[in-house]
Amino acid sequence: MNDIVSIINNDPRIELYVLTALRIINNMIKGSPNKKYDIKVYLDSSMSDDILGVASVYTNEIWLNENKMADLVLLNDVDYNLLSVVLIHEILHILGMIGMDGFGLVQGEEGIPQNVYIGKHGIEHYKSILSENGFDIANIHYLPIENNFGEGTHRTHLEEGLDGNNEIEKRYIDDVYYPVPTNEIMTGFINKYNYITPITLGILEDYGFKVDYDSIYVTSVGKRLIFI
């Protein structure tokens, strides 16, 4: 097999989550710029209720919240186990998303403008999803990155559209409104309704991965895809 990601797991309780996540990841990603990824996955019963999973990009390890094993969410309008969706999110972090790749495609507090992604394909597909959902893209030049919620979320996820008090925050860059898909899988929080969009694949392409935009697991529209 030519799968880009494989998972080492000795706990039969998470076998379903692993198989689901691998099916989706390896359907979307067809080539890696430098290596294959062998990832170890564990359950952790000590995680607080507001933490669903944690990934180490240094050791290629992922910990999932054992207390969330029975929970369900939707991904692309289809029911999935919550931890399957969390595992996909954490695998994407290990692949470099977002800003963990060393390519310098995220502008932080020191950038002008601040907290944006500047990679070609990520921006291109952000604009395409905006256009497909009826937004004007004439003056869109960046992809907003999360600017709230502190270490672990700040600047390592797509913009959620919320401020640090969980109030709606519309992003304006150079006085231009930048609508954001608040439940894209690489925002900072897994929601009841989640979507894998071409934005995620565009960023991976910027990182050198070969991706399949026609994958059945990628969508630009959704019944509950929300823009803020």
Model-inferred region functions:
Residues 1-88, 93-225:
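Extracellular zinc-dependent metalloprotease catalytic-domain scaffold
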